[in-house]
Amino acid sequence: MSGNSFGKLFTVTTFGESHGIAIGGVVDGCPPGLEITEEDLQVDLDRRKPGTSRYTTARREDDEVQILSGVFEGKTTGTSIGLLIKNKDQRSQDYGNIKDRFRPGHADYTYDQKYGSRDYRGGGRSSARETAIRVAAGGIAKKYLKEVHGIEVLGYLSQLGPVTVDKVDHSVTNTNPFFCPDESKLDALDEYMRDLKKSGDSIGAKVSVVAKNVPVGLGEPVFDRLDAEIAHAMMGINAVKGVEIGDGFDVINQKGSEHRDTLTPEGFSSNHAGGVLGGISTGQDIEVHMALKPTSSISVPGKTINKDNEEIDIVTKGRHDPCVGIRAVPIAEAMLALVLMDHLLRHRAQNTGVLSTTKPIAGQA
């Protein structure tokens, strides 16, 4: 299996399966001298880990990360950073009934067709369990971005089913189990999720993430456009079915006179483009939104086929998130941080010392 690595100069490679002994990863390209501890990485891992509220899967994992290499006396050495998280709460017996059945909406059928075999226990390599390592690696990137460049990456749940946030207060996001930035929507979210769990069904969601204080100039103008690589990163998250940068699909109904972000000596008058023009960051906030499908692992009976191509009934057992979008918030933050970290290093490698004759303008007037 290829495709286990992400990034060019700041590279993350992950390994492991949902019900294996452990999951792990290697981070290459981190500059030396960054102060980092396991506790630093644990903050976002605790936000992502399962079993923390009634609204997510009942599987309980501590998700305690171990730094195996690349850090000495509390600082990065510039060598490969090894990360490991042990799996503790697997219940592989819950999946015995799907050994020869293909769960609809999952990777069971495609893995079987591509590899001729599959790890049916919790989805194996296709499980979102793997994203815990992305979050740990993203924690390294987030710390570097903030401490060295003042860049902050902030994610939140912007919609869950029919419940949409009306305002964004980042100080509220991490005070509730939904990562919702609108305090007035918490009761509606709670009521909706309680009813959903009783029905045994699941629901989709929209997650948003913004990067603040990003400098102008990150990204390459052709194949490695900053927005293209952000979309690549977000589409690589389990269950993501669509990504928008800035106004996204709303631009269909916009006129050019409305959509263009006017430049003034004081700064940009708007940010419809989401902080990227021509594949290069403008210095404005980078705004990203993604749609996540409802999980297909539900207790509502359905139809599928088995390995003998016979139509059969299926009810998925196991412990699953009724809305995968909730725990996707720290994952989205991590992936955006990894993209920005990679492009900062690439920009530094090629463009150090480059000066434009035009003075940079503010991100927002």
From Swiss-Prot:
The UniProt entry's GO CC annotations, sorted and at most eight, read: cytosol
A GO BP term, please? amino acid biosynthetic process
Which pathway does the record list? Metabolic intermediate biosynthesis; chorismate biosynthesis; chorismate from D-erythrose 4-phosphate and phosphoenolpyruvate: step 7/7
Organism of this sequence: Alteromonas mediterranea (strain DSM 17117 / CIP 110805 / LMG 28347 / Deep ecotype)
Q: Name the protein family.
A: Belongs to the chorismate synthase family.
Summary of the function given for this chain in its UniProt record: This reaction introduces a second double bond into the aromatic ring system.
What GO molecular function annotations does the UniProt record carry, in alphabetical order? chorismate synthase activity; FMN binding
What reaction does this enzyme carry out catalytically? 5-O-(1-carboxyvinyl)-3-phosphoshikimate = chorismate + phosphate
Where does this protein hold NADP(+)? 48, 54
How does this protein assemble? Answer: Homotetramer.
Transmembrane regions: none
Q: Where does FMN bind?
A: 125-127, 238-239, 278, 293-297, 319
The protein's name: Chorismate synthase
The protein's UniProt keywords, in alphabetical order, are:
Amino-acid biosynthesis, Aromatic amino acid biosynthesis, FAD, Flavoprotein, FMN, Lyase, NADP
Q: Which domain of life is it from?
A: Bacteria
CDD domains named among the record's database cross-references: Chorismate_synthase
> Which cofactors does this protein require?
FMNH2
Which cysteines in this chain are paired by disulphide bridges?
Answer: none
Cite the PROSITE patterns for this sequence: CHORISMATE_SYNTHASE_1 (PS00787), CHORISMATE_SYNTHASE_3 (PS00789)
Instruction: Give the matching NCBIfam families.
Output: aroC, PRK05382.1
Fetch the InterPro entries from UniProt.
Chorismate_synth, Chorismate_synth_AroC_sf, Chorismate_synthase_CS
Q: What class of enzyme is it?
A: lyase
Enzyme Commission numbers on file: 4.2.3.5
Q: How is the cofactor bound?
A: Reduced FMN (FMNH(2)).
